[in-house]
Regions:
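Surface-exposed, charge/polar-rich loops and edge strands
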Residues: 1-21, 25-37, 51-182
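Short hydrophobic beta-strand that contains or immediately precedes a catalytic carboxylate
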Residues: 39-42
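Active-site-adjacent structural elements in enzyme catalytic domains
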Residues: 44-46
């Protein structure tokens, strides 16, 4: 939720024209099924932030793949096959069956480790990887397996020093976006 709250602050300070320009520069990658339904592959946090501010918001997108089937299960299987689903809950438990994914962005669970990774990216500890969906969650899962002091998405400070050290360590070198020592 840390990224969502930060983006909401940014969006609330922008004019409608500034917001439109920003959204045009960050289109949402989509998968379209045979019925014409669209599935988001990335930008979930950004759009959730906007939806919470304005439930009628619209954005720009582009289709990166098409799945002929009309069946939701077939589409979910294809997304999973391509690595375009993250099937863990906010506590890192999973994988859960794809059919249990929420159908609304507003129903996605908070993952404090994903928030921690967002903060590390924002600080420049991690390199952005726009072509690798869900790499932030992979980082979060990795950090979750390491000892960190108690924290939550609204209060990341206790975990940041240890998370920075871990993210720069050689043990993290297999993760997309790793930069190593500063």
């Amino acid at each position: 939720m840390a990224e969502i709250r930060s983006r909401q602050l940014d969006f609330s300070e922008e004019s409608q024209e500034e917001r439109r320009r920003y959204l045009r520069s960050k289109p949402v990658p989509l998968v379209r099924n045979g019925a014409g339904d669209l599935w988001m592959v990335d930008r979930h946090h950004r759009l959730r932030a906007l939806l919470e501010l304005d439930s009628r918001v619209s954005t720009y997108g582009y289709v990166i793949a098409e799945v002929e089937s009309h069946d939701r299960s077939d589409v979910l299987r294809e997304l999973q096959r391509r690595g375009w689903l993250y099937l863990h809950d906010g506590r890192g438990k999973g994988p859960c069956p794809p059919e249990q994914l929420p159908s609304s962005l507003l129903d996605l669970e908070d993952d404090p480790y994903r928030s921690l990774v967002w903060k590390l990216k924002k600080e420049g500890v991690l390199r952005p990887q726009p072509l690798i969906p869900y790499h932030e969650f992979r980082w979060g899962a990795w950090l979750r397996s390491r000892p960190l002091p108690p924290f939550h998405s609204g209060f990341l400070d206790p975990a940041l020093p240890a998370a920075r050290r871990l993210a720069r360590s050689a043990a993290a070198s297999h993760l997309a976006g790793w930069k190593g020592e500063a």
